[in-house]
């Protein structure tokens, strides 16, 4: 238990450290005091070196206390001596006091202090270097002497009683060893025993007693000549134009020959013989000549020489030819600024901005400058150079956080000229927090990805099968009992359907051929249909017209298997239908002018009514009848017919015409006028002899009165009973009463066996085809038609509905086996 408690405490304590480690933000590093120095024993300064800032802004504070006091004071001045320093003026300086000094670094997380530094002002005195060092040679008694003179440090107070001790060192210019000469408190020194004809380098330093030596002064050089001689030839070092409007030339003097020497610059212009002297020796510094705008010609070549003269003679430099266009070297860019930008949702970058050189006339376009920058880490040695072009700003990306960079910029003219000097160094430090944020994001993403992978692996191990089943569910098998899966896989649909007790698919090639709207035939004298109760003369002019076929494959012609099977067995025959325009004329003409026999059976008190609003879609082609008659419908069973008759209150009598189309049906329209002679009769007989069917036409006169409901017994002939195969195929209709007996219709003592339905015509006419052999053979099977019972509420119905049966002389059929048809479209019932 104790071990668990200890481990928990350790984890809790390590959490802040882990957080600090992940974010790379920590306490500041320990600063270090480098040195403390007093220039004249009256003031002093201390400098320190900062440690790491811990990734956060850090403040540095210097605290001190005196040996005789316990009170702690803060630095009085952080600016005078520069960055990371503290300056103590005379008010805060005591020469006989020891100071205990520490530096504290503080950031948001914490603070850190340097080691204490004990300072006694008398022991840290280090004056500045002497200034104004001059060298001069003098000859005394043919001996050459060197006189060196200087001044005390600049901060030394002349009114003070401090005494400086000086020390001088010199060496030949070609050697490395220095010769040191103590001077004392004097500010000049005379040196002899020098080698004539050699150049020497001289430096001076000083100290206070007690204290430390100052830094050496700057170097001064002098040539010790062996005797009196003219000066050496000077050398022109360079000529430069900063803005392509003025220029300056510099030279390097030679040996002066032991005498003071004067230098003069002379020049002449191309194409002129006149010689001019330098207009200004002071503006550009010593050993130089400045040409202002008045003395500068942009398209002129200058021939320049420098002449050195002393008491012993003179000497001139080599001529130097100058064209201002090619000596342009602008000044370094000014106002260089470095700024670290922190855009939202983007990485930080360093923005560098600068200004063109002050003397360059860039706005007017007289001078166009290109810029180049370089940067490196403070501790690095190699510079990274970037060409910027003519813009005065640049964005630096991909800088390493936590490092301090040095940046410099220079420029040059876009055409002729040279690069300027590099600008002064600019420093900027890139904080660590940007890289830390990126690291945190990647660490979090890595941890989350690892957790997700572990969870998915664990889930797959424990519930792999369920996951696979959920992602890839199994294909379900057939659930119908009795299906042979082998037949289903092999694709034998016919055997599969036969196993299920379903009929095979009907041939698709004949569906359209079985469809026809209606066939109108107008017969004249020899070809006529007789109504049941009226007689008359047929019209002298009749037309035989074949209308356009309805090719709706969804009609009943495609649904009836009997028609399909019969159609496949029949030969090509021309379908025909007869339409009687005048029934009375046909009856009058019947006696001696036509060879066809017509038998009409009158049916009284029996009608079929159909309502347009409640009618269903027929399985036979719906015909648009003339005089805006509604389309007729057919059904496959008495039950459906009973549904129609039991749900309609307003129905009209309609006739259904069923047509047996030819296998190769053609769309054509024939119009013929029958005059009444024997030639027309023979033509009609030949036309009908080409077909294998005899039509029976049933016409029902329409009534304007609304009829009541019909009894279901009216529709009793709805299917085929049997097919005779004795001599020629014959179809017998089946009566669907309870007695189950077969009824045959006879007219004038002749039994009629209906072979098939031919077609459905307009004007409510049903056409059937009888057997030709029965027309000439009497039969004893004639029975009167049974009348169906009428509904007592039924209204008055027209009784002039007739069924006319005609047969051509020669109606040949091919004995093609058992043929039957489904006359489910027989809407009226027969007596």
Curated annotation (Swiss-Prot):
Placement of sequence motif Box 1 motif: 471-479
Entry-linked Gene3D superfamilies: Immunoglobulins
Extracellular side: 24-438
SUPFAM superfamilies: Fibronectin type III
Intervals, Cytoplasmic compartment: 460-831
Region (Disordered): 527-563, 776-831
Top-level taxon in the UniProt lineage: Eukaryota
Signal peptide span: 1-23
PROSITE patterns, alphabetized: FN3 (PS50853), HEMATOPO_REC_L_F1 (PS01352)
Transmembrane domains' residue ranges: 439-459
This protein's UniProt keywords: Disulfide bond, Glycoprotein, Membrane, Metal-binding, Receptor, Repeat, Signal, Transmembrane, Transmembrane helix, Zinc
GO biological process: positive regulation of cell population proliferation
Glycosylation sites: 59, 91, 100, 112, 132, 262, 303, 315, 335
Positions of Zn(2+) binding: 414, 416
Amino acid composition bias (Basic and acidic residues), ranges on this chain: 545-554
Stored Pfam families: EpoR_lig-bind (PF09067), fn3 (PF00041)
Localisation per UniProt entry: Membrane
UniProt domain comment: The WSXWS motif appears to be necessary for proper protein folding and thereby efficient intracellular transport and cell-surface receptor binding.
Family, similarity comment: Belongs to the type I cytokine receptor family. Type 1 subfamily.
Function: This is a receptor for the anterior pituitary hormone prolactin.
Protein name, entry field: Prolactin receptor
Lineage, opening ranks: Eukaryota, Metazoa, Chordata, Craniata, Vertebrata
Primary gene name: PRLR
